[in-house]
Structure formats: structure tokens, C-alpha cells
Amino acid sequence: MIALALVAGACRQDMHDQPKYKPLAASAFFADGKAARPPVQGTVARGHLHAEDAFYTGRVRGEPVAAFPLPVSRQLIERGRERYTVFCSPCHGALGDGQGMVVRRGFRQPPSFHVDRLRQAPPGHYFDVITNGFGAMASYASRVPPEDRWAIIAYVRALQLSQRAGLEDVPPEKRKELESAP
């Protein structure tokens, strides 16, 4: 008898008979009067995942991309500086020399971005490392969206240029300002 009562209780239609809105029905709950809601930001429509796009993978035909898949602008580099400060500088240091605060606390030192091997690495290499991790570095794919990964890479390139820049690298109009400064 008790078993029959337990089984009968499990036969309720709660999941079938639940309060819900039908697609495109009217709704008094939402201010716009529609039950259909816009997709959450970052939603990918079925069949539209850009898994083969260089922007999202950092690769073309399996090889790291040699050039940025988006225009590099001052705004992109500034965004990269902001993101680098948050995600990268604790280990890699503010100058990209591998002397971040975690190293001073006894953790393993990451490589400097200023060694020839990394100065010559294509942007796709950095994208892959940020996405998948490398050595002691964990993947940042879940924390840093692709747009910000490219921004960070642009900033790393700016850091690399800044550490070995000469007067000949300065545009002529700015060079005159520097030479005339006291």
C-alpha cells in the first residue's frame, strides 16, 4: 500500500503542466509586452560558431597567424594595456620582463617577452598561449574573450617595441620635439 502511494505520487504532471509563456505570446510581465526575450550577449546561433575563423582561433590552416586579424589602433592597444594589467602583469610584470609580483613571492618566473624567441613569435602564437595555456600558465580562454586577447597581444607588441626603440623609430615630427626638449 505504501509503495503504491509513493508510485502514484510520482505520476504527477508538474513538468508538463507548468506556468510558461508560449513563444511570441503577449506578456504583462515584461515592459515591452512580449514573452520572447532577446538572446543573452555572446549567444552563438546554431551553425554559426566561428571555430575556423582566425580571429577566434589565432590560426590559419593549422598554423599561427602571422598578422593581426583586426586593425591595430591606439584604442586597441589601450584596451590591451588595461587587460594586460589585470590578467598578465601579476606574472609577466608591468614591462613584460617576467618580473611580476608572483615571482617575487616565490613562484616560477615566466619568460620575458623581450627574448628573441618571443619577439619573433607570430601574434597567433600568443593567441594560442592565452587560449590554451603553456607550461605553468593556465588557459585564460574562459576569462579573456577573443577581442581582448588580440588587444593584449597588440599591447605586448608595443611593450616589445618600447624596450628596444631607437631614435630612428620615432616619427620625424615627434623626433624634432624630442631633440628640442631641454
Residue map of PLM features:
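Periplasmic c-type cytochrome electron-transfer domains
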Residues: 11-75, 121, 144-155, 175
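Sec-dependent bacterial lipoprotein signal peptides
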Residues: 1-9
